[in-house]
């Protein structure tokens, strides 16, 4: 399988029904923007051009790693602080936000609620299956970074909770054949 085919399949994963036209238009625009006044005498072989790019990208990766680790450390400290404040003030009522996302762009708002240490019940009944899978994929990534939990409640509903919330899934009576573990496959309902 060629590299181009892999990129096409990767892009196809993120495209939806109406996005195919936009992707084709963006490819045409990118080709039109490329400068055409390069001189053949100054062109270097392809091997020489690729090597400096690999070196520069690896050096950028090394410089970005400490800042990302610093961000994760600060985020973890903030979550611990919120967890301690929450355990001290146990008399407060706990609320669970219920969200009905209609498009993939609603996912960052749900992650913002998780970042604010709130539990969210998400019902994907108004989304297509492709959009719902993409949204679940996005939420799973956020869950991993924020150390939260993502549990399946029913065929189209998922419960996203912060690290300090414990969900006893046995109390939720699921019908036979429905698993509570996270799964990208929404076809199994």
Swiss-Prot record:
Entry GO terms, CC: cytoplasm
Biological processes annotated in GO: division septum assembly; FtsZ-dependent cytokinesis
UniProt region (Disordered), positions on chain: 25-70
Record-linked Gene3D superfamilies: SepF-like protein
InterPro entries: Cell_div_SepF, Cell_div_SepF/SepF-rel, SepF-like_sf
Subcellular location: Cytoplasm
Extent of Polar residues compositional bias: 27-41, 54-70
Family, per entry: Belongs to the SepF family.
Function as written in the Swiss-Prot or TrEMBL entry: Cell division protein that is part of the divisome complex and is recruited early to the Z-ring. Probably stimulates Z-ring formation, perhaps through the cross-linking of FtsZ protofilaments. Its function overlaps with FtsA.
Binding partners and assembly: Homodimer. Interacts with FtsZ.
HAMAP family associated with the record: SepF (MF_01197)
Protein name: Cell division protein SepF
Annotated organism of origin: Streptococcus gordonii (strain Challis / ATCC 35105 / BCRC 15272 / CH1 / DL1 / V288)
């Amino acid at each position: 399988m060629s590299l181009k085919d892999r990129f096409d399949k990767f892009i196809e994963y993120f495209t939806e029904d109406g996005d195919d036209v936009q992707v084709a238009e963006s490819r045409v625009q990118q080709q039109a923007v490329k400068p055409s006044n390069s001189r053949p005498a100054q062109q270097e072989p392809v091997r020489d051009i690729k090597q400096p790019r690999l070196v520069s990208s690896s050096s950028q990766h090394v410089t970005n790693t400490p800042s990302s680790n610093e961000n994760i450390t600060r985020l973890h400290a903030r979550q611990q602080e919120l967890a301690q404040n929450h355990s001290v003030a146990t008399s407060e009522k706990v609320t669970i936000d219920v969200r009905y996302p209609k498009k993939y762009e609603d996912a960052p708002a749900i992650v913002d609620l998780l970042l604010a240490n709130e539990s969210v019940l998400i019902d994907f009944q108004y989304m297509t299956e492709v959009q719902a899978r993409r949204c679940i994929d996005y939420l799973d990534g956020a869950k991993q970074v924020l150390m939260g939990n993502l549990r399946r409640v029913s065929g189209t509903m998922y419960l996203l909770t912060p690290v300090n919330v414990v969900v006893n899934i046995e109390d939720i009576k699921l019908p036979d054949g429905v698993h509570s573990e996270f799964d990208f496959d929404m076809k199994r309902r």
